[in-house]
């Protein structure tokens, strides 16, 4: 299992609009092969920054998604919200203890 974690800073005061757009765009991708779930989290100390995380069955499924038309459409929609740098990490999940 792998997790994709992206940190980014948004335009000042744009979080609510970004979150609405994120929810709308990613609701289209719920059936992406290998996708186990997503989280969007806002920094408690800096309301204009946060993380988007997605959990994947394997790296191949994640890479296929990152090359897809859906991913390109989503990124084109979300990119205007970002200012400055954003960074993405791909990590292998070593331990899980999720409670529903």
State what each model feature region is.
Residues 1-50, 57-67, 81-100:
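Short S/T/G/P-rich N-terminal loop/turn motif that feeds into the first structured element of a domain
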Residues 72-74:
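A common structural junction motif
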